[in-house]
Structure formats: structure tokens, C-alpha cells
């Protein structure tokens, strides 16, 4: 799920900077097939997980083509009133990924490569790494777990079942990277949008993206990003109140604290050999507290 912030949120903010979209545009403008009862949903609602969509949807067992799967999501009944509840939701970011493609004319891998990864010289970051990265082989990629419907151990292909069912490129999951590349991305955000004289986002965009957009709701969210001032935050309790971050299901996380000019990238394959190990939930905040205390 680091894909949600590294690729999708960054891409949406780039499109906003380009004047292609606006945060408060109605989803209906880009998805005319959206049912009328959902016409009040905006890009803002998707980015802050306040659209009302459910947390998870099963697409991998549906005999549908790609666009039919998008329509299936659009037709899902809402679990909450629009704008009333923050409920972390994969469907939100699947739709945002499709929105990037409809507006830019490029799929997420192409758009993020052109706008983010190539300018940052992130040479080991891509969707579908075995097909899209030179000199990358399976023995250089951490294994995930055995997948029953694929009938194989997952190595070098996306772990997330829905992303796999969507062609391995989606807004909610699927990105592969490494520590060196992600450190460039984190430094770019710590430096307010610029790294090695390459401006990826404007200072104002980074500031706007990482502020609290859901103060009136029970959970604090930035645009795409999680915020530190939430109950039982994975970022712990010692980062400054400016900190923002995100986690990934397979055992990854990024936390960035502009207040102390600190970024923490934590990459594991905790789902190998099985997703049953959930100790990382308690480990993450303890790790971040330790790092914050030592370095401050």
C-alpha cells in the first residue's frame, strides 16, 4: 500500500499542478458511469478515505475484464455517508489510479516513471519489475507468500490479489522498489518537493498534501498520507506533529518528520512464508520511537 502515496497520491498532485484536475472535482466528471447516488463524491473524498466506499473488495474471483471491474467498484453500495467517516479503503485508490490513466492517457507505471521516478533517478522502482526493470531477476526480489488461486509462491509479481487481477498495475498496490530509491523519494519530500535540483512537486503542493484535511472527523488524514496524531499511530509518539507516513500490507512503511528532518523507511517481507505473522503492528511504533529518541 505504499503504492497509494508514492505513486497515486503523487500523481494526483502532479495532475493538480498541471491544471488537469482539481481536488474538489466530482468523480462523475471522469467516471460518467458512476451511479447517480454517488455523484457527490469528489477526488478529495477518495484521497482522504472519506468517500463511503468499503475497505476491501474481491475482484480476483470475478470473471470480468478490466473496465468491468472498475464498473463493479463504482456500483458498490456505500458503507458510510459521503464525507462523514474516514474508512481506509482500497477501492478509493483503485479509482484514483484509473483516474490518472483517464486524464493523462498513460497508465500509472508510465506516468509515475515520467513524472517521478526518472527525474529522481529511481532506477529500481516500477510495477511488474521483471518486465520493466533491466538487470532485475527473481533472486533479487524478496519472496512474499504462497498464493492459492495462482498456485505458486509469489516472487517478483504483485502480492495483492486485486492488483494482480487488474493487470498488476493499480492505484492501491503493486509498486516494487528498494531502500536506495525510496530514500531519494523521502529526501525529495523532506526538501519540500526537490531533490538534486529536480523539482518533482512545488513547496506549496507538499505543504498542502501533508496537512490535516479531516480535522472534523474522528481520524486525521492528509491527502493520501496518514498523520502522526492518530490513536495507536504506526509512527509512534515521538515524532513531531508535522510527521506523516504510510504502511504497506506486505511489511513496509515510510514515516517522514519535517520537524526533525528525519525519514524512516522500513522494508520487510513479513508475509513470507505466511501473512499470519502480524507482530509488525506492534513493532513499527516501537521502532519509530527508538529511532526518534536516538537521533534527537
In which residue ranges do the predicted regions lie?
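Active-site SXXK
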Residues: 1-24, 93-101, 182-185, 261
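Short, glycine/proline-biased beta-turn/loop segments that scaffold the active-site neighborhood
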Residues: 3, 22-37, 118-120
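Short, surface-exposed loop or secondary-structure junction motifs
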Residues: 37-242
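Short loop/turn motifs at secondary-structure junctions and domain boundaries
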Residues: 245-248
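Short, surface-exposed beta-strand/loop micro-motifs that present aromatic residues
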Residues: 250-263
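A short acidic/small-residue loop/turn micro-motif
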Residues: 270-273
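Surface-exposed amphipathic alpha-helical segments
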Residues: 280-296
Amino acid at each position: 500500500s505504499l503504492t497509494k502515496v508514492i505513486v497515486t497520491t503523487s500523481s494526483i498532485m502532479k495532475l493538480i499542478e498541471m491544471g488537469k484536475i482539481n481536488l474538489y472535482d466530482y468523480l462523475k466528471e471522469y467516471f460518467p458511469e458512476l451511479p447517480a447516488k454517488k455523484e457527490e463524491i469528489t477526488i478529495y473524498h477518495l484521497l482522504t478515505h472519506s468517500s463511503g466506499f468499503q475497505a476491501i473488495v474481491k475482484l480476483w474471483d470475478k470473471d470480468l475484464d478490466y473496465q468491468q471491474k472498475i464498473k463493479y467498484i463504482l456500483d458498490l453500495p456505500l458503507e458510510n455517508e459521503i464525507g462523514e467517516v474516514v474508512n481506509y479503503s482500497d477501492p478509493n485508490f483503485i479509482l484514483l489510479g484509473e483516474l490518472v490513466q483517464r486524464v493523462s492517457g498513460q497508465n500509472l507505471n508510465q506516468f509515475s516513471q515520467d513524472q517521478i521516478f526518472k527525474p529522481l533517478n529511481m532506477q529500481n522502482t516500477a510495477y511488474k519489475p521483471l518486465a520493466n526493470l533491466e538487470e532485475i531477476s527473481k533472486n533479487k526480489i524478496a519472496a512474499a507468500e504462497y498464493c492459492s488461486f495462482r498456485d505458486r509462491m509469489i516472487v517478483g509479481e504483485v502480492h495483492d490479489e486485486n492488483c494482480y487481477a487488474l493487470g498488476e498495475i493499480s492505484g492501491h498496490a503493486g509498486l516494487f522498489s528498494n531502500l536506495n530509491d525510496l530514500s531519494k523519494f523521502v529526501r525529495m519530500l523532506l526538501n519540500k518537493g526537490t531533490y538534486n535540483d529536480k523539482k518533482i512537486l512545488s513547496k506549496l503542493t507538499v505543504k498542502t498534501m501533508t496537512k490535516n484535511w479531516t480535522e472534523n472527523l474522528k481520524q486525521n488524514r492528509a491527502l493520501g498520507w496518514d498523520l502522526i496524531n492518530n490513536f495507536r499511530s504506526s509512527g509512534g509518539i515521538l515524532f513531531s506533529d508535522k510527521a506523516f507516513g504510510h504502511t504497506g500490507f506486505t511489511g513496509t512503511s515510510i514515516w517522514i518528520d519535517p520537524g526533525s528532518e528525519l525519514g524512516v523507511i522500513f522494508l520487510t517481507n513479513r508475509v513470507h512464508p505466511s501473512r499470519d505473522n502480524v507482530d509488525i503492528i506492534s513493532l513499527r511504533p516501537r521502532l519509530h520511537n527508538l529511532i526518534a529518541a536516538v537521533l534527537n
